[in-house]
UniProtKB/Swiss-Prot annotation:
Species, as recorded: Shewanella oneidensis (strain ATCC 700550 / JCM 31522 / CIP 106686 / LMG 19005 / NCIMB 14063 / MR-1)
Protein name: Deoxyuridine 5'-triphosphate nucleotidohydrolase
Family: Belongs to the dUTPase family.
Catalysed reaction equations from the record: dUTP + H2O = dUMP + diphosphate + H(+)
Residues involved in substrate binding: 71-73, 84, 88-90, 98
Length: 152
């Protein structure tokens, strides 16, 4: 199923020097976001930098949201993860997409212009309405949490 999402190009290099975000394969869940920086950027160990992607989106449908997620190779090989762990893009947000890059390694990381640094995934959203109760109906789990079910 393909849902149309409005996309605004904020950096003219997108669509000319660098492709629009797209799914790499028919089974891809995410589209790569690129570092649309003006010059090479070095992220020191322990440092967090906000990196522009050169695009803005407007999801519009309140039944959807976008998530900005890390790319597995950057985290595993270089220690580059998202400073906020997951970026949530609400359906009514229309501003530029930025990526908070955190270098959790002990070596500097160099980000080149146009490098793929995160991925954009669209997910369904359910807005809940709370119902106040004095007690919950019992369940098998009850109040067990934080390791309650063990590791084996």
């Amino acid at each position: 199923m393909k849902t149309p999402i409005e996309l605004k190009i904020l950096d003219s290099r997108i669509g000319s020097e660098f492709p629009l975000p797209a799914y790499a394969t028919p089974g891809s869940a995410g589209m790569d976001l690129r570092a649309m920086i003006d010059t090479t950027m070095t992220i020191a160990p322990g440092e967090t930098q906000l990196v522009p992607t050169g695009i803005a989106i407007h999801v519009a449908d309140p039944g959807l949201a976008a998530l900005i997620l890390p790319r597995s190779g950057l985290g595993h090989k270089h220690g580059i993860v998202l400073g906020n762990l997951v970026g949530l893009v609400d359906s009514d947000y229309q501003g530029p997409l930025m990526v908070s890059c955190w270098n959790r390694s002990d070596t500097p990381f160099t980000l080149e212009i146009g490098d793929r640094l995160a991925q954009l995934v669209f997910v369904p959203v359910v807005q809940a309405q709370f119902k106040l109760v004095d007690e919950f109906d019992s369940s098998d789990r009850g109040e067990g949490g934080f390791g309650h079910s063990g590791t084996k």
